């Protein structure tokens, strides 16, 4: 499976066809072969696939953020990436929700909730597929797809909360609450990033970066599941800071934030660990995702 995934990556670079699509198709074919031999008990995938998906999304966004070179001249491309993500996401939500209402017959706001995941330009697909692009275009894809993930998750949880309360999706009070959550997650992300950065410098054990990844994933889950915050912002901020801390820390604050114990070798080691882990988790997630799709769902028009 690892060899196939590696070959798919090489093929994606040369053909610009997303390697993750090939992995999903491979999983679907494997499911068909397995079912033809009478192996149909795949209930364990209902638990495994979401876990791999969460870890994979975190690692993909982290890897992308670590590679970004943040400078003043990059503000324009960051702004363009954000605006493109927001506009495309909103247009997609409107169009897909209308399709669900008119063609499938889903009621509103259920159609909107179903439309949101399909409207996101997922970084899990876009970032790996952009590996063969020139740096400028690759950076734009990273920013646009990452912002699409973040905005999509925020809108999704916002919509679910509104439906659970029996309130309209658009209103002044809930929108102000959403803005407050964004401000809160940014503040928490900065605090957690500072603590993890200090922890990297203080750990003397030869195995420390897996601990940092574990703490980062734990913080993400607490923010997403318990606090109901858009925790992908945390991953994005941590990755950008760790990859650009020498440029991002103002001179007057450098005496409070020590960076002497974090060298280029440490960053290279962390980048390598993140890249290898991302490749491994991404491989098994999309394979198992394709494997988890019931074959009969391709001819079913009724939503789950």
How would you label these PLM feature ranges?
Residues 1-304:
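Transmembrane helical cores of multi-pass secondary ion antiporters/exchangers
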């Amino acid at each position: 499976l690892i060899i196939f995934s590696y070959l798919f990556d090489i093929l994606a670079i040369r053909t610009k066809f997303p390697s993750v699509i090939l992995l999903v198709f491979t999983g679907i074919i494997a499911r068909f072969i397995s079912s033809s031999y009478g192996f149909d008990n795949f209930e364990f995938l209902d638990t495994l696939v979401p876990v791999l998906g969460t870890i994979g999304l975190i690692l993909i966004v982290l890897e992308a953020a670590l590679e970004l070179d943040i400078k003043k001249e990059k503000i324009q491309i960051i702004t363009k990436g954000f605006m493109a993500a927001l506009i495309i996401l909103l247009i997609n939500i409107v169009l897909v929700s209308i399709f669900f209402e008119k063609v499938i017959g889903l009621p509103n706001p259920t159609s909107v909730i179903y439309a949101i995941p399909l409207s996101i330009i997922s970084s899990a697909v876009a970032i790996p597929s952009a590996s063969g692009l020139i740096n400028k275009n690759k950076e734009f894809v990273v920013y646009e797809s990452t912002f699409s993930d973040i905005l999509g998750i925020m809108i999704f949880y916002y919509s679910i909360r509104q439906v659970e309360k029996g309130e309209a999706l658009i209103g002044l009070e809930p929108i102000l609450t959403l803005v407050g959550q964004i401000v809160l997650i940014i503040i928490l992300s900065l605090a957690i990033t500072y603590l993890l950065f200090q922890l990297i410098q203080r750990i003397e054990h030869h195995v420390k970066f897996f601990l940092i990844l574990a703490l980062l994933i734990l913080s993400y889950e607490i923010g997403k599941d318990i606090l109901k915050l858009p925790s992908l912002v945390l991953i994005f901020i941590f990755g950008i800071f760790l990859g650009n801390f020498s440029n991002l820390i103002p001179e007057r604050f450098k005496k409070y934030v020590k960076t002497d114990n974090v060298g280029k070798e440490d960053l290279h080691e962390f980048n390598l660990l993140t890249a290898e882990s991302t490749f491994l988790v991404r491989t098994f997630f999309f394979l198992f995702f394709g494997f988890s799709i019931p074959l009969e769902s391709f001819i079913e028009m009724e939503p789950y």
